[in-house]
Structure formats: C-alpha cells, structure tokens
Amino acid sequence: MNYEFERESGFINSQPSLAECLTSFPPVADSFQSSSIKSSTLSRPTLIPPPFEQTIPSLNPGSHPRHGRPRHSPDGCSPLPTASLPPEYPWMREKKASKRNHLPNSTTTTISNGPVCFSPKGSPEIVESAGGGGGGSRRLRTAYTNTQLLELEKEFHFNKYLCRPRRVEIAALLDLTERQVKVWFQNRRMKHKRQTQSKENHNAEGKGPSTEEGIHSDEEDEAPVFDRSGALLERDTCSFQKKSHGSAQQHHNSVSMGFAAAPLNSNDKNLKHFPNPSPTVPGCMSTIGPGSASGPDNSDSPPALDVSIHDFQPFSSDSCLQLSDAASPSLSESLDSPVDISTDSFYFFSESLTTIDLQHLSY
C-alpha cells in the first residue's frame, strides 16, 4: 500500500516535472504557432496567388502589380519576376504560335496560286488567298511575266473594258484567273486616267500665257475687221446718199421746169448745186442742217422761184469762210464722235466744197 502510495506519490511528485514540461510548452507552442503563421504566410503566396494572378491580370492587368508589391515586400521578394511573368503565359505563347503558323500557311497558299512580287509595269495586283489564313493578314501582290504583260497591254490598247467571255479567254490563254485579269484591267484604267489628267494639267500650265497672247491677238485682229466693216458701211451710205442727192436734183429740175416763173441764171444754178452737200457726213447735219434744209424747201415752194436775182447775192469770200467755219466744228465733232468717218465721205464732202468755190469764182 505504502509502496503503491509511494508510487502514487512519486507519480504525484513527478507531476511538477510534467507541469514544468507543460509550463515550458507554451513558448514552444508560441514558436510553433508563429512558425505555423510564418509558414502559412509563406505558403499563401506560393500556393494561392498563382491562380489568382493568372485569372485577374487577364481581366485587369493594371491591378496585378498593385497587389503583388505589398504582399512580396515583407518577405523581401522583388516584384520584377511577377512583372516579367505575364508576357510568358501559356495562352499567350499559344496565340503567338498560332500567328506564326498562320503566316506561313497564307504565304504558301498565295505562292501556290502564283509568284509574289511587284509587277514591273507598276500595276499592282492583289490575290485572294485560297486557304483560311489569318483574317488580318495583308494580301500580297501578283507578278506577271513579260509575255503576260505584253498580251494584257495589247488587249488594253484595243479595249479598255473587257466583256466576260473575252476575259475568260485571256485568263485561259495566259494561265491567270479571271479575277486577276479583271483587277489588272481596273488598275490599268486608273493608271491611264492619272496619266491623262497629269498631261492635261501640264499642257494647261504650259499653254496658259500663250493662250492669253492669242486672245489679245484675236482682239487686235477683230478691231481692223470692225473698222473695215465700218468703212464698208460708210461707203454704202455714201453711195446711197449720192443716189438720193441725184434724185433730189432731178426732182428740183422737174419742178423748176414745170413752173417756169423765171429763167435760171447763175445764182439758181448755185442754189441747185448748193443743197445738201452735207448728207455724206452724218455729224454735219446738225450744223449745216438749217441751210441745207432750206434749199430744197425754198426750191420746191413757188415763192422761192419768184425771188429776184438781187435777193440772191453772189457768194463772197466771207460766206465761204463762214461755211468752212461752220463745217469745221461739225467735222471736229464728227471726229470726236464714236462714229467713224470714211475717207471716201470726207473726200466727197471736200469735193462738194471745192465745186461751190469754183462756181463762185466763175461768177
């Protein structure tokens, strides 16, 4: 009993050691807890964030460096590897690989259709790729051989536009597709249009001053024609006035012979020659009009025939000077007037004046 008690007491006595062990355990537990917390903090960014970083940056890549920097800063890890990781994602590698794979496929399909380069004639051709390559890939240009270009240029020289049967025939002869022939003709028409427009613009710029000089020369040429036509009109009016003057003289002679009031003498002859010397000049009718108009009126009326010889004084030098003075302003006005006086009319007027002077001197 005592032994057992001793055992129990020993056991009881041994409890403080256990208590001591238990009392010594809390710091171990604290260390364990702190280590577990540290391990958890270490394990969290290594295990949990990768799927978080793989999903979120694809949706919002700008938010990734903001979350990564505060999490990795207490551990001393640099954020550079996290920033370099996004361009190396597998889905991005697959897309790049797909682009690289699509480009050779498209080039091989275009090469299978025909050689790819620029045509020497400057007419680029775009070929439609047969395979389902990348939608954004640019279609390349087709090169034509010299024989193909020669035949196409010949056909374009004769026909700017092709009908479909002829287009199919040319495509079969030149080993081209119908679309290639159609596009070549479209581009060739545009090139021809540009060339013609540039030539027209160049010719218009080169002929600008020459055309203006030609216009001035035409105007200068038209002026003499107008003068000549005016001279012809003056000649026609002069001849018409001569005829009318002759008819007036005949009428005057018939009237004077019918009445026979007094024999005609030198003064009556002067009166018969005096009337209307001015109808040849259109501008002189205003100044010499009263004197010239009174002649036929007085000659046609019976009182004019009854006038005695003493009333009609022979023309003196003063009267001739007055007549010339009266005629000179009319001539100056006629020269200033826009109506041109022909030389024939002027000569006829001067001849009429000289005949009057000669008749006056004879008496």
Curated annotation (Swiss-Prot):
The record's section on PROSITE patterns has: ANTENNAPEDIA (PS00032), HOMEOBOX_1 (PS00027), HOMEOBOX_2 (PS50071)
Indicate the secretion signal residues. none
Spell out the residue ranges making up region: Disordered. Answer: 30-88, 98-117, 189-220, 268-308
**Bias regions of kind Polar residues — which residues?**
31-44, 103-113
Location in the cell reads: Nucleus
Pfam families found in the cross-reference section: Homeodomain
A GO CC term assigned to this protein in UniProt: nucleus
Motif Antp-type hexapeptide: which residue numbers? 88-93
- Matching InterPro entries: HD, HD_metazoa, Homeobox_Antennapedia_CS, Homeobox_CS, Homeodomain-like_sf
Q: Which keywords fit this entry according to its UniProt record?
A: Developmental protein, DNA-binding, Homeobox, Nucleus, Transcription, Transcription regulation
Per the database entry, where does the chain bind DNA? 137-196
Task: Extract one GO molecular function annotation from the record.
Answer: DNA-binding transcription factor activity, RNA polymerase II-specific
Q: Give the protein family.
A: Belongs to the Antp homeobox family. Proboscipedia subfamily.
Q: Provide the function of this protein.
A: Sequence-specific transcription factor which is part of a developmental regulatory system that provides cells with specific positional identities on the anterior-posterior axis.
* Protein name (record): Homeobox protein Hox-A2a
- Gene for this protein? hoxa2a
